[in-house]
């Protein structure tokens, strides 16, 4: 058994968060929500370059290995996840709140063990093909290190086995020349960052900024142990009140709950991202970037990119089943709101951690090229009508692990500059 000793209340990260208090209730939630409604615009600063004080690590801005401001500039380098050794997470309260009831027996039986061998083998092959196609399109591909996620670990607050390194979008976000490691909210993902450390250290040595958000203890207080699981109606009511399975005990967030459009970054409060986590990001990125909270009619939000996926300057795919409550913000800014067609993934295909709407979880290679599932003909036709070339890849078995093309990747470098698309 892998045992890890850590200081209670400690933080693995380069940024400190003020201690808010041991009892966080409605007052804090309301304050945080009001705080987030808008942030002040600011002029560009040294974030836009890769310059560092140490001459040995001071490349010219054009040489920085990390540079990405949005979801659609020409893609030059990307991290693609791995399905190898992926494990079913233990069936804890935070996992239960983020999965469909029909799969609960699967988690109860298989938690702590590898996902079905044949399924993983197919998923590995699909992602290898995806990597080959990206390389053919001129994109540099990096992969996380293989890790055995079945190893048990223990902290002073919990013990668990791991999950996978399949979804770099969940743990990493690039903002300009900085790569940020998210703290995550599932106990099974506590050590997921280890798979990416060799890549990130390489970027750091070559001049990129590297930040790790404060690591949560993931103590019992972070989770609402009485969160109603069965009632969708109750979940709708609680979501409208900003209450989820994660509490405001300490900051937590998944990077996939943020989506970028130049100076403006949009975030949702979800089952894995709390208001304190978003506040940490807002303070950390200010004044160069503005972080806005948006919300959706979604009883079980987890990750924004299969609900609200920005595919170009002022162009967004908006999930018709999960309408955005703040859509007028984008309409007033002149954005084009596109409703993607209903996905056609079969009902009997296992989706252990996600919904069928992974069909809209696409990866833009640039404004005129998109990587889309080879089986999803309706959305292919939609893109073609928009004048966007579709690069068709089959990742149906990889979908079962909880992500589409956007989830399976983290765009490290796109050829572009910092701009504002909301003013």
Swiss-Prot record:
Phenotypic consequence of residue 254 to N: Significantly reduced activity
Entries under InterPro entries matching the protein: AmidinoTrfase
Keyword Acetylation attached: yes
Molecular function, one GO term: amidinotransferase activity
Effect of residue 208 to T: In CCDS3; uncertain significance; loss of glycine amidinotransferase activity
Residues reported to bind arginine: 170, 305, 322, 354-355
Stated consequence of mutating residue 170 to N: Complete loss of activity
Domain of life: Eukaryota
Coiled coil feature spans: none
Result after altering residue 282 to H: In CCDS3; uncertain significance; decreases glycine amidinotransferase activity
Effect of residue 415 to Q: In CCDS3; benign; mild decrease of glycine amidinotransferase activity
Free-text function comment from the UniProt entry: Transamidinase that catalyzes the transfer of the amidino group of L-arginine onto the amino moiety of acceptor metabolites such as glycine, beta-alanine, gamma-aminobutyric acid (GABA) and taurine yielding the corresponding guanidine derivatives. Catalyzes the rate-limiting step of creatine biosynthesis, namely the transfer of the amidino group from L-arginine to glycine to generate guanidinoacetate, which is then methylated by GAMT to form creatine. Provides creatine as a source for ATP generation in tissues with high energy demands, in particular skeletal muscle, heart and brain.
Family classification: Belongs to the amidinotransferase family.
Disease field: Cerebral creatine deficiency syndrome 3: An autosomal recessive disorder characterized by developmental delay/regression, intellectual disability, severe disturbance of expressive and cognitive speech, and severe depletion of creatine/phosphocreatine in the brain. Most patients develop a myopathy characterized by muscle weakness and atrophy later in life.
Name of the protein described by the UniProt record: Glycine amidinotransferase, mitochondrial
Provenance organism: Homo sapiens (Human)
């Amino acid at each position: 058994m892998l045992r890890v000793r850590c200081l209670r209340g400690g933080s693995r990260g380069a940024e400190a968060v003020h201690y808010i208090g041991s009892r966080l209730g409605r007052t804090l939630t309301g304050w945080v929500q009001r705080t987030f409604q808008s942030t002040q615009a600011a002029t560009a600063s040294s974030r836009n370059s890769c310059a560092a004080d140490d001459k040995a690590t001071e490349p010219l801005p054009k040489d920085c290995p990390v540079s990405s401001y949005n979801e659609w500039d020409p893609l030059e380098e990307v991290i693609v996840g791995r399905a190898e050794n992926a494990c079913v997470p233990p069936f804890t309260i935070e996992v239960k709140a983020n999965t469909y009831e029909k799969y609960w027996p699967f988690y109860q039986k298989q938690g702590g063990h590898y996902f079905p061998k044949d399924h993983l083998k197919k998923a590995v092959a699909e992602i290898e093909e995806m990597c080959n196609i990206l390389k053919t399109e001129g994109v540099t591909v990096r992969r996380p290190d293989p890790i055995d996620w079945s190893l048990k670990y223990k902290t002073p607050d919990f013990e668990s086995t791991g999950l996978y390194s399949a979804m770099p979008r969940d743990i990493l976000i690039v903002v300009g020349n900085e790569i940020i490691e998210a703290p995550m909210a599932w106990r099974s993902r506590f050590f997921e960052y280890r798979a990416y450390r060799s890549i990130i250290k390489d970027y750091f040595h070559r001049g990129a900024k590297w930040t790790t958000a404060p690591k949560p203890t993931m103590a019992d207080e972070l989770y609402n142990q009485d969160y109603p699981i069965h009632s969708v109606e109750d979940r709708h009511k609680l979501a409208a009140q900003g209450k989820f399975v994660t509490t405001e005990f300490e900051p937590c967030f998944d990077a996939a709950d943020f989506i970028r459009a130049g100076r403006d970054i949009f975030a949702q409060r979800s089952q894995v991202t709390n208001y304190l986590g978003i506040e940490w990001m807002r303070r950390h990125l200010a004044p160069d970037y503005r972080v806005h909270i948006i919300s959706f009619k979604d009883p079980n939000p987890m990750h924004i990119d299969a609900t609200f996926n920005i595919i170009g300057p002022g162009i967004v795919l908006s999930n018709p089943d999960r309408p955005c409550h703040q859509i007028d913000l984008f309409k007033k800014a002149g954005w084009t709101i596109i409703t993607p067609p209903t996905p056609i993934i079969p009902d009997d295909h296992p989706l252990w951690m996600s919904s069928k709407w992974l069909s809209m979880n696409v990866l833009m290679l640039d404004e005129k090229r998109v990587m889309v599932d080879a089986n999803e003909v309706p959305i292919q036709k939609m893109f073609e009508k928009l004048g966007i070339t579709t690069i068709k890849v089959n990742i149906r078995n990889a979908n079962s692990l909880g992500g589409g093309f956007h989830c399976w990747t983290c765009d490290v470098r796109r050829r572009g500059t910092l701009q504002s698309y909301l003013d």
